[in-house]
């Protein structure tokens, strides 16, 4: 029997509902419960796949190929349970399903309305996503009072009534601002937010109050009195320097105990030793390294959320503080590569579009010629191929068909546009296994024996997640291999290049997949850990080229 804990937000957005939900989920998991997390997004887009990173931040890709909200990344990093397309639903996806059913005649000619048809679809999606776990934590995006959120709030209100308090609970996240000029905290925004929620028919059981300063006991009692919530269930969520402290912070305030008690559950105590170790290492690093991340969304670091966290996870494994130096790729086109000087490693992440491309290519060249550890992810791998083709293989006008419609040397092309060994363009249609769509989700990859990537993973076959439309053009494989580029990873069928590396370089890897999506703070990821060890060696002046002949 699944129990549901619904998380709503008030006053302002971006208070950290996702991290709060994920933190509570990992505590409940540590107490022996099976847990899943679901995100309901009120926007009308079907998914965030076509949204600008400036609008939405990173698009998080699940193993089954869903393009989802970045909060699902927090879910997987905190809770050792995989998520899928069933863990993220948008208004667009809900309406798409309702309209499809109406066209099929499923509603028997009835008038299709928000209540009951849309709300019933929302409830169906929530229950389908819960999938027989002990507890489903369901986060409703946006802020109470937003018109877009109303159908979702009505749906969870109905679930609370239908399933009862023994199976449903409501947690509301609010802001308790500190007014510096007055020198005091203000509880009115929280009071009014809860009043708005209660007007919809939802009485929260727990309040999590974001605050920059400790909330005095008197203010806590006032909040409890005016919101009809038990004083002990008014939880202070203070600003912390490290989000991985939050599970322990919430546990110390008894949040998991309140949840278990309200549901009448007798659970073993939580073992949070793993989280304590993570926080201890991050608080007491043995050194620090600087990684230059070259991209075009550097003004909004949420666009690289999983990548930022993966580097920090590698810092935990190597006991280093990772300083990420964000470098605007367009600035490299104007000012040269001076912004990369002093970096211990260089990373070019995935991305789309032509803006800043030449700057990224210059960053690849700088890393190659300066023998600085380089990791290119997705687009970063493709640009490493282009740079090498231009400057080492004699293909001066090498480019990708993503940026130039008819380049003289299309070393990178659409998955549907391939050159045969005879140099003829082969057009694949939608009947092909990859079709004309983006390659998404977990895909198997074979690693060549004796290569650096093979040593990094310690295995011959891996599965990593993808999100791309373009791939290396096999017509140029022999030319680039003769020039010294190693092709060390392949798709399962051997048709697509997944990994390239430079044998004569201390550490230079480009991968078509996104390893950041499978990195977690407690387990890390072998590729990022190896990348950081190479950065440490470069910093300390002990870097040596990987000898393929000895492996």
UniProtKB/Swiss-Prot annotation:
Protein family per UniProt: Belongs to the CTP synthase family.
Residues where Mg(2+) binds: 71, 139
Pathway the protein acts in: Pyrimidine metabolism; CTP biosynthesis via de novo pathway; CTP from UDP: step 2/2
Keywords from the named record: ATP-binding, Glutamine amidotransferase, Ligase, Magnesium, Metal-binding, Nucleotide-binding, Pyrimidine biosynthesis
Mechanisms controlling activity: Allosterically activated by GTP, when glutamine is the substrate; GTP has no effect on the reaction when ammonia is the substrate. The allosteric effector GTP functions by stabilizing the protein conformation that binds the tetrahedral intermediate(s) formed during glutamine hydrolysis. Inhibited by the product CTP, via allosteric rather than competitive inhibition.
UniProt key word Calcium: no
The protein's name: CTP synthase
HAMAP family, A to Z: PyrG
Pfam family, one: CTP_synth_N
Residue sites binding CTP per the record: 13, 146-148, 186-191, 222
InterPro entries documented for this protein: Class_I_gatase-like (IPR029062), CTP_synthase (IPR004468), CTP_synthase_N (IPR017456), GATASE (IPR017926), GATase1_CTP_Synthase (IPR033828), P-loop_NTPase (IPR027417)
Domain of life: Bacteria
Other remarks in the entry: CTPSs have evolved a hybrid strategy for distinguishing between UTP and CTP. The overlapping regions of the product feedback inhibitory and substrate sites recognize a common feature in both compounds, the triphosphate moiety. To differentiate isosteric substrate and product pyrimidine rings, an additional pocket far from the expected kinase/ligase catalytic site, specifically recognizes the cytosine and ribose portions of the product inhibitor.
Binding site residues for ATP: 14-19, 71
One Gene Ontology cellular component annotation held by this UniProt entry: cytosol
Alphabetical GO biological process terms: 'de novo' CTP biosynthetic process; pyrimidine nucleobase biosynthetic process
GO molecular function: ATP binding; CTP synthase activity; glutaminase activity; identical protein binding; metal ion binding
Job of this protein: Catalyzes the ATP-dependent amination of UTP to CTP with either L-glutamine or ammonia as the source of nitrogen. Regulates intracellular CTP levels through interactions with the four ribonucleotide triphosphates.
Active site location: 378 (nucleophile), 514, 516
Catalyzed reactions per annotation: UTP + L-glutamine + ATP + H2O = CTP + L-glutamate + ADP + phosphate + 2 H(+); L-glutamine + H2O = L-glutamate + NH4(+); UTP + NH4(+) + ATP = CTP + ADP + phosphate + 2 H(+)
Binding-site residues for L-glutamine, renumbered to this chain: 351, 379-382, 402, 469
Region called Amidoligase domain, residue ranges: 1-265
Residues annotated to bind UTP: 13, 186-191, 222
């Amino acid at each position: 029997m699944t129990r549901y804990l619904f998380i709503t937000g008030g006053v302002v957005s971006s208070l950290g509902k996702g991290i709060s939900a994920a933190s509570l989920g990992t505590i409940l998991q540590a107490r022996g419960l099976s847990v899943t997390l679901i995100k309901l997004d009120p926007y009308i887009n079907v998914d965030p796949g076509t949204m600008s990173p400036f609008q939405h931040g990173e698009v998080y890709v699940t193993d089954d190929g869903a393009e989802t909200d970045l909060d699902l990344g927090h879910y997987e990093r905190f809770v050792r349970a995989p998520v899928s397309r069933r863990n993220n639903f948008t208004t667009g996806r809900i309406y798409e399903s309702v309209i499809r059913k109406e066209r099929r005649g499923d509603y028997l000619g009835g008038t299709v309305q928000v209540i009951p048809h849309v709300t019933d679809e929302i409830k169906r999606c929530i229950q389908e996503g819960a999938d027989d776990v002990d507890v489903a934590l369901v986060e409703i995006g946006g802020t109470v009072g937003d018109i877009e959120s109303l159908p979702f709030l009505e749906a969870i209100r109905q679930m609370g009534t239908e399933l009862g308090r023994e199976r449903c609970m409501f947690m509301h996240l609010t802001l308790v601002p500190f007014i510096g000029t007055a020198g005091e905290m203000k509880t009115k925004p929280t009071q009014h937010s809860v009043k708005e929620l209660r007007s919809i028919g939802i009485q929260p059981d727990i309040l999590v109050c974001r605050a920059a300063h400790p909330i005095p006991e008197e203010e806590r009692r006032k909040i409890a009195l005016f919101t009809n919530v038990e004083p002990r269930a008014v939880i202070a969520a203070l600003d912390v320097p490290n989000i991985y402290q939050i599970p322990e912070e919430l546990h110390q305030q008894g949040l998991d105990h309140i949840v278990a008690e309200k549901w009448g559950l007798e659970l073993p105590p939580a073992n949070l030793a793993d989280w304590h170790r993570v926080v201890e290492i991050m608080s007491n690093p043995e050194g620090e390294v600087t990684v230059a991340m070259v991209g075009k969304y550097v003004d909004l670091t949420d666009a690289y959320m999983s990548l930022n966290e993966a580097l920090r996870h590698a810092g935990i494994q190597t006991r280093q503080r990772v300083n990420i130096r964000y470098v605007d790729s367009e600035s490299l086109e104007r000012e040269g590569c001076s912004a990369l000087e002093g970096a211990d490693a260089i990373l070019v992440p995935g991305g789309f579009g032509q803006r800043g491309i030449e700057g990224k290519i210059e960053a690849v060249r700088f890393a190659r010629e300066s023998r600085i550890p380089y990791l290119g992810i997705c687009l970063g791998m493709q640009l490493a191929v282009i740079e090498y083709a231009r400057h080492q293989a004699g293909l001066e006008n090498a480019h990708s068909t993503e940026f130039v419609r008819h380049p003289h040397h299309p070393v990178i092309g659409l998955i549907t546009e391939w050159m045969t060994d005879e140099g003829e363009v082969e057009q694949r249609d939608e009947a092909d296994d990859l079709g004309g769509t983006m390659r998404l989700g977990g895909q198997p990859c074979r690693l060549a024996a004796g290569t650096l990537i093979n040593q990094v993973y310690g295995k011959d076959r891996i599965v990593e997640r993808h999100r791309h439309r373009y791939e290396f053009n096999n017509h140029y494989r022999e030319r680039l291999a003769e020039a010294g580029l190693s092709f060390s990873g392949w798709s399962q069928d051997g048709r697509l290049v997944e990994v390239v590396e430079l044998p004569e370089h201390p550490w230079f890897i480009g991968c078509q997949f996104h390893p950041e999506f499978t990195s977690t703070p407690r387990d890390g990821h072998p590729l990022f850990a190896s990348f950081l060890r190479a950065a440490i060696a470069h910093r300390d002046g002990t870097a040596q080229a990987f000898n393929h002949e000895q492996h």
